[in-house]
Each structure stands twice: as C-alpha cells, then as structure tokens.
Amino acid sequence: MESLQKIDLHLHLSRIPLPRTEQMWVSDPAEMLPHMAELGIQKAVLMSTSENSQPQMPFGSNADNRAIAQADPSHFAWMCNLDPLDPDTIPERLAAYKAEGAVGIGELCINRRLDDPLLEKIFAAAGELELPITFHMSPEVGYSYGIVDDPGLPLLECALQKFPKTKFLGHSQTFWIEMSGDAPTEKEARNQWGKDSVAPGGRVPELFAKYPNLYGDLSANSAGQAILRDPAFGLEFLETYADRLFFATDMVNAGMTFPLGAWLDEQTAKGALSTQAYQKICRGNAQRVFGL
C-alpha cells in the first residue's frame, strides 16, 4: 500500500520550550516535527487550552497556537478555545478567531453540563460560523475537566437535535466508553477506557446512526480502545462512519505514541479496512470538513 501522509486532528504543543521532567513535558514545534514525520503525519491541528494565557496552563493559548500555525502553515493549523465569560460576546469572539485562521473550536473543556446556557451559546455560534467543535467530556461537574453529560449521553443527544448545523466531534473516555451497550454508570468507571468486547446497544453507535452532525475524534487511548477492544466491531464502525471519523493522536510530546495509527495502517495493508475508508479517516475528512 502506498504510504499516506496523515493529518492529525488533535495535537498539543508549546510555542517555546518549557521546563521538563522525565515523566512529563510538552514539546515545541521543532521537537515534534521529526516525531510527526516518523509517524507519517504531514500536518496537525493544534488544540487550544484557553482563550488567554493562564499561569496554571502556560502553553496552548489561542495566541500561542495561532503563532505556531502562522509560522508553519504547511505543518500546523489550530482550533480556538473560549474562556467561560461574557456569554453575549461569544459570537463576536468566535468570528474574530475564525478571521485569524481558527478552523474549529477545541478542545472544549468547560466543566459545565451540556445544556448550560453558556455552552449552548457556543454551540449556536459555532453552527452559524461553521466552526466544528472538538469536545472533551467529563462524567460530573467538579470531577474532571470537560463538558458534562449523564450516562447514556442524553444531553449530547439534545444538543445534536437542537443545533443541527453544528458539527460535534466526540472525544475522551466518558464519550467513547458509550461505544458499548453495557457502558458503566458510575463516574469513576465512566472516566476509564473501554475493555472487552462491545455489547450491542451502545449509545455512540446509536447517536452516529441518528445524527449526521456527530463526528468522532479518534485520539488517545480512549478512542483507540473503543476501536481496538473489539476489532471486528471496530472495523465495521470505521467502515460505516468513515465520512465522520478523524485520525488524531492527542500527543503532547515527542515521546508519545498511540497504537491506533499503526493498527489502521496494518488493517488496510491486509485488506481488513478498505483503502477508501482509510484515506477518508486519515486525511480526506480533515481536508473536506476543516479545509486543510
């Protein structure tokens, strides 16, 4: 199979080198680019951590990511983020970030329930401005970062119905654990990767079948395990929804890799995943939906 240069729809970087430890660090573009090349990634979309630089998160602000993308547009694009303030100015702020080059909103992590008025303002404006949203989901307000939904994702379904023009990209454990019909309901278990075979009746497949504005960010081990836990089911899901799934990594440094990318390569090489689905997931959808 001819090598395909992937587009990674979910990457975190620091604009400048930061202090590092052996356990954790955030790469800058110079360090990440060779790693991307090793993984067959030609371009990556940067996730913003905040609208404005904050001491507790000294990397990944809108301004930082905009600067990275403007300095090297052949390798980087960026999504903007919003801080939870001034709801009435949300449309204007998002329009300004789009004018500055933002291709979407992400990753949206405001720790409020999905039907919160501020989040609904974001969803509405995103639809009007044609800015897709990559969201991180949490099982409970105050438990972990991310927008919040209940077991079974009832609030997400309401949002998909209420904002049909808005493209929602699901991400994180609490979203992808709902791939299986036996998804847990306890908050700790909802924040874990899925294990074992996928049981029928999962809410993620059901919502994908019902709502064409639901998309999937295939990053990290949350999405990786959703696919790899049951390879036969995973391959069927990839084929069925190939138009709405995006290869992504969620890497923050050049020491990280996730297994799904190589697995997609292997499955396509042996004919288990169609070349058409592979090309859409790994590159074509990002080009079509985000204009990359």
Where are these regions (language model features)?
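Mobile, glycine- and charge-enriched loop segments
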Residues: 1-23, 61-81, 204-205, 211-215
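Divalent metal-dependent hydrolysis catalytic cores, especially in the metallo-beta-lactamase
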Residues: 23-25, 30-54, 75-83, 103-107
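Catalytic pocket-lining loop regions of alpha/beta-barrel enzymes
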Residues: 103-104, 119-247, 255
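Active-site gating/metal-coordination segments in enzymes
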Residues: 56-151
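Acidic-and-aromatic substrate-binding clefts and catalytic sites of carbohydrate-active enzymes
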Residues: 17-27, 51-60, 83-89, 110-117, ...
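Active-site neighborhood of phospho(di)ester-bond hydrolases with catalytic His/Asp-centered motifs
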Residues: 6-9, 45-48, 79-81, 106, ...
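Mid-to-C-terminal alpha-helical segments outside catalytic/metal-binding sites
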Residues: 1-43, 95, 242-246, 252-292
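A general structural detector for well-ordered alpha-helical segments in enzyme core domains, enriched
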Residues: 31-35, 61-69, 93-97, 118, ...
